[in-house]
Structure formats: C-alpha cells, structure tokens
C-alpha cells in the first residue's frame, strides 16, 4: 500500500470536479480531528463537457488524467479511488415522505432505515437514478421536527426527505471517463451540496441560507433551514 511519510493510502480522499471549463483534482488528508486538509491540487482546461454533461469522452478523459497528473506532482502516493462531483440540467429533486410502524415501540436503527427506504418509494423516470437521500425531519406519532429519533418511544415513525436524482447516461459517461484513467470511482456527490459542506457553518444552516455555485456551464443552488437541505436546483 502506497504511503506518504507515515500516512497510509486510506488516510487520503481524492475528489474530482469535472466542470464545463476545467477539471480540478483535489487530494485531501484526513486529520486527527476528522477534518480534511488539502495537500495537492491539479487543474486542466476542459472541452469535453457542455452544461455539466459529457459530450466528448476522449477530451474529458484527457482533462481528468492531466488534472490528476498535476496533483500527483506534489503527492507522494498513488491515486486509486476517487469521488466525483456532479451537476447539470439532468439533476432533478423532490421532497418525499414515508411512514412505518415502530416494531418494539422504541425507534431502532432498523426502523430509521425502513422509514427512509419507504420515503424513496416514489415513481421516478426510468432514465433517472437516486443520487442522494437527504433526511429533513422525523415525526413520531404527533411529535414533529425531530432530528434524531433513535431511542425515542412511539407507535408510528414518519420521515421527510429530499431526494436528488440524476440521469443514468450522464453517470455512465462520467464513470467511463474515470475508469479509462485507471482509477476506481467511489461515488458521486452533488456539486452544490459538496460546496455547502465546505463553506457553510452550522449556525448558517440552522437559521436558513442558500448557497449559489456559479460554474462555467451551470449555476446550482442548495438551500438549508434547521440544518437540513430542503431545496436543490
């Protein structure tokens, strides 16, 4: 396993922002306080995307590879796994809810999983897939605005969630480009959601805030109230 000093490979997170105007590769080191410290960055102009969607496989692959090569110039390790930010007009979202009975009259992790799964049981177009399920609040019997229901007593558990979906073909084309570069794709993250994690404070998300991510081909937003994402565009 590749190392950088005394750090193991799994102490690093690699992220790709595959944008319309450029591709950026970030390598972050996980600190003892569970924060991420950026240790390497690579950037290369992109010509293979339009409005966040791949329109040229070869050009996109080349930009990804060259951005990673730049990042590796200051990183003593091997890039094997990566998370990719995703945006574009193919991203859709909706709010949904689910209801289940609480099996043993006390909420368990299994109950939480079931009620979130129930909230996902909505019809989405066959050419779309679920990207994120973002819990907003839980309701136990008549008590609402619950953020963490684990261990609470009740009979009926409800969940309100924000669902984000993306086009299957958009995902598949990005996967193809990443795999051509010889690395494993760990997952996708909605671009504006990733941006909000890095720039918004807990107080801002509690009081209510909207972040606007202006890119070369798309402008994307996410709004928060009471610490939860309620709308994404």
Q: What is each stretch, according to the model?
A:
Residues 23, 217-221:
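Short glycine/serine/threonine-rich phosphate/pyrophosphate-binding segments
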